[in-house]
């Protein structure tokens, strides 16, 4: 059954968020749009907007601008998902990320989901590649490395993809539980 009152909007830089957005839209049989092509007018025709973006330097890339757009559109329900290189198993790190990026009110009112994805140096901007290089040098030169430092150092050595369709399941379950 096509979910015509729902749309998945994504902001993707290296392709991971787009990949997950496409999986969600296909599974839920709903509309899909790149964030750069949407307007408040367009979104006003939907009851539910599922917004996906990447974690960039510990922040939700483009969320503040997107939030203003969603508020202007009058959409009744916003759902968030973010993609990042941090494994889903690092629950404390993911929880700290949400607390840093959403107000306590948003944490309570906006359903939010994290999906591990990966790193793709080949598709990163020059600025992002340089930022990763600096981070790698800083961790490499750090004395008394923690286990987390060592894991981070290994994780940023090269491109990798740890995304999987299984990571959309909590979001899909939530969407299926909604009474439209």
Could you describe each region identified by the protein language model?
Residues 3-4, 58-180:
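FMN-binding flavodoxin-like domain, especially the glycine-rich phosphate-binding loop
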Residues 1-75, 169-180:
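N-terminal beta1-alpha1-beta2 submodule of the flavodoxin-like/Rossmannoid cofactor-binding fold
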């Amino acid at each position: 059954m096509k979910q015509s009152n729902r749309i998945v909007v994504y902001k993707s830089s290296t392709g991971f968020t787009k990949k997950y957005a496409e999986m969600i839209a296909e599974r839920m049989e709903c509309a899909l749009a790149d964030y750069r092509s949407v307007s408040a007018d367009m979104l006003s025709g939907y009851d539910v907007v599922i917004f996906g973006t990447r974690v960039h330097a510990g922040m939700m890339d483009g969320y503040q601008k997107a939030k203003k757009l969603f508020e202007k559109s009058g959409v009744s329900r916003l759902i968030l998902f973010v993609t990042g290189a941090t494994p889903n198993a690092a629950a404390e790190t993911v929880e700290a990320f949400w607390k840093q990026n959403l107000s306590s009110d948003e944490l309570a009112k906006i359903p939010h989901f994290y999906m591990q994805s990966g790193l793709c140096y080949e598709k990163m901007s020059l600025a992002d590649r340089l930022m990763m290089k600096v981070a790698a040098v800083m961790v490499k030169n750090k004395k008394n490395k923690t286990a987390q430092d060592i894991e981070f150092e290994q994780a940023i050595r090269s491109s990798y993809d740890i995304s999987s369709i299984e990571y959309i399941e909590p979001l899909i379950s939530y969407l299926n539980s909604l009474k439209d």
